[in-house]
């Protein structure tokens, strides 16, 4: 019975909502009909005549002031709307309408799910947003002391944001600490050092830890932050390697004795892999590229499961420097798999290899006459695939936007990843003759294949909408963040811009040509009310005069 009563109330409520939704037009016409019938008792005609006489007595100066004031007010609204859109990415009027006015007017989504389903949907969307905007450690991140700090000394600008450095601090605590650190004094000091915000305090803590013991993580901190050259950093990393290998061998023998020993061994493994990868990067930066490639290959064979460091991206860049394109293709064959996460490095390197086969002889004029060959079509499709994954990269490769130092963390498919890729790989594209020309001729064609407005992707998942916000947190304030897709101007900005321009033009014309504008206004009003007068005359001619007389007497 209770369920039946609830169902009846729901049906009654839906009927009332339906009546308010569809019958308001009928009530509107009924009100218009009543006003027309009561026009004599209400003296509507006399009032209209009085208003028209008053308007005829107004001078052109009044209309100039009226249109000028309207133009000023709409201009102020336009300026505020534009400022709000530039700062928050949305229209203030639209936001207020959706957030406050729509609930008051009873705007309800009839297809809204139940409360439980809505909660589940919100949870799913939040999980999707988090996964889309996951921030990754930059595999090719620079050295803080030897590169980032040198940039600050020269330019006076900070290349890293607080958000980026805070993420690095969290990474260090995850990789370089464990629950048993308090049992060893040097590791206990370093555990506090990784949480310290002041760089000098971190460096002092690392020196203090080294006075107690040969601590690998202390050497890592000094190599990253205190060393002012790559040579100094390499020396410190070699000392860290010696200490780290000893800790790794000891913990490897005890890893099966308990959960604490297993956690310690995991920490020592992370430390050892990090040191060897950074040593390989030092060798690459110092010109010993073949040595760096060997170190990276050995590291990937020794620890094949530690894919979180993305060492294959370091290997790809080093192999491109050696112009070992066959080895690059072999690495891509392993990692450019549908089941593995993609990156700009993988997609654009694959495009570079296919472009290399045809770019030296490619001519857009010849291609337009004879059509694209199979190899050229494959190269263009690879470029389109790469651009769809990260549409920000081509502007940096084509030097349409200036590069900055890459951050320590990147957002895949975002501007930060594009900067990190182009910073290291621009030289490889320039080395391949005609590759940048082919990219310049074909990359914009990608956007004709992607559905708009981006409900679904073409080869990848739809482009995430949160990249701009995350990139603004990762990139310094002096860099202009690349935004995709470009935001369209809201309707109210266009409307107020048109209203401001139109009223300003009316004010100018009324001031310069008052008589002509008066004639124009009268002609416009008479034309505007001509259909209404025609309808009224037809109604009076159709209705019987006796009925019409009785209705007007009511």
Curated annotation (Swiss-Prot):
Q: Does the keyword Transferase apply?
A: no
Q: Which UniProt keywords apply?
A: Membrane, Transmembrane, Transmembrane helix
- Where does this protein reside within or beyond the cell? Membrane
Tell me if Membrane is a UniProt keyword of this record: yes
Membrane-spanning ranges? 15-35, 62-82, 489-509, 516-536
Recorded GO CC terms: membrane
Membrane-related topology note = Multi-pass membrane protein
Where is this protein primarily located? membrane
Tell me the protein family, please. Belongs to the ST7 family.
Specify the signal sequence span.
none
Q: Protein name, please?
A: Suppressor of tumorigenicity 7 protein homolog
What the entry lists under InterPro entries is as follows: ST7 (IPR007311)
